[in-house]
Swiss-Prot record:
A GO molecular-function annotation: 6,7-dimethyl-8-ribityllumazine synthase activity
Domain of life: Bacteria
UniProt keyword list: Riboflavin biosynthesis, Transferase
Pathway involvement of the protein, from the record: Cofactor biosynthesis; riboflavin biosynthesis; riboflavin from 2-hydroxy-3-oxobutyl phosphate and 5-amino-6-(D-ribitylamino)uracil: step 1/2
Enzyme's top EC category: transferase
Catalytic reactions of this protein: (2S)-2-hydroxy-3-oxobutyl phosphate + 5-amino-6-(D-ribitylamino)uracil = 6,7-dimethyl-8-(1-D-ribityl)lumazine + phosphate + 2 H2O + H(+)
Family in the record: Belongs to the DMRL synthase family.
GO BP, one annotated term: riboflavin biosynthetic process
Protein EC: 2.5.1.78
InterPro entries with a match to the protein in the record: LS (IPR034964), LS/RS (IPR002180), LS/RS_sf (IPR036467)
Function: Catalyzes the formation of 6,7-dimethyl-8-ribityllumazine by condensation of 5-amino-6-(D-ribitylamino)uracil with 3,4-dihydroxy-2-butanone 4-phosphate. This is the penultimate step in the biosynthesis of riboflavin.
Record-given protein name: 6,7-dimethyl-8-ribityllumazine synthase
Binding locations of 5-amino-6-(D-ribitylamino)uracil: 25, 59-61, 83-85, 116
Amino acid sequence: MLHVSTIEGQLDAKGLKFALVAGRFNDFITERLVGGAVDYLVRHGGDRADLTIVRVPGAFEIPLAAKKLAASGKYHGIICLGAVIRGSTPHFDFVASECAKGLAHVMLDANVPVGFGVLTVDNLEQAIERAGSKAGNKGVEAASAVLEMVRVLEQI
């Protein structure tokens, strides 16, 4: 049998600092995502004093705040949360796409894990389902992914 070295991240937030960037647009959804992410990090050993929440107008502004936070060197990971709900115009497509691309650039340019917890949904029902209802809480999932990546990168 061939032995292969495996690197995996442990889900332990103790001693780590995280920034959460939350869009205020659709805040009745976003606040559920923030609550889920904060609860997850605390349950996994994080300290509320090591969490910073930055509020921005909406999803389009999230990448700029994330970029500034990543460049500060103060945070081990950044968790980005928001909700873009499709309307009757193409605006949804532009905002969702540019937010995702912007966050990918931040992560790759800064070498800091960035979680994409920005919901891109067709309607309010889907948003509610993904903010702590039937489909779980995507804020929790984004926090988990960032935590795991922080711990993976420590080993590479």
